[in-house]
A protein has these predicted regions:
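Disulfide-rich extracellular domains of secreted proteins
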Residues: 1-132
Length: 132
């Protein structure tokens, strides 16, 4: 994966390399109240030049609408774990268990850097949900 065809470091820049992930098979009871969502990324970049980072957005409607983006710190050149969100972070919206099922939940990851020649490696994407 690379940083796309533009040099903007904005998470919402359209000329960035983006990838969708889904089918997390989250076992949520239909009566669950969602308290928070956490996304784990295991990733690195080929260099820190251009301040490479990953931006993550969530969708509960199959990708029709998206949450505001959250971004990692600058990626290092050795694989590390980056965690976005948390046990009490709902990413700016209210979720239902059905939205977090395989038909609804999408994770969109954008590769962002201020240089065009940055290469990214993403080895793991995980989603966990805190609920009652």
């Amino acid at each position: 994966m690379d940083s796309g065809t533009g040099t903007s470091t904005s998470c919402t820049a359209v000329r960035k390399d983006r990838h969708l992930y889904h089918d997390f098979n989250l076992p949520l009871p239909v009566s669950a109240t969602i308290w928070g969502i956490q996304v784990r990324l295991d990733a690195y970049a080929d260099s820190t030049v251009g301040t490479p980072k990953l931006c993550v957005e969530l969708s509960g409607d199959g990708g029709a609408t998206w949450t505001p983006a959250k971004s990692t710190t600058v990626l290092g050149t050795v694989e590390s774990t980056y965690v976005l969100g948390g046990a009490t972070d709902t990413w700016g919206r209210v979720w239902t268990p059905s939205e977090l099922g395989n038909a609804g939940l999408r994770v969109r990851i954008s590769m962002v850097a201020s240089t065009l020649d940055r290469d990214f490696s993403l080895d793991y994407v995980g989603v966990s949900v805190t609920y009652q």
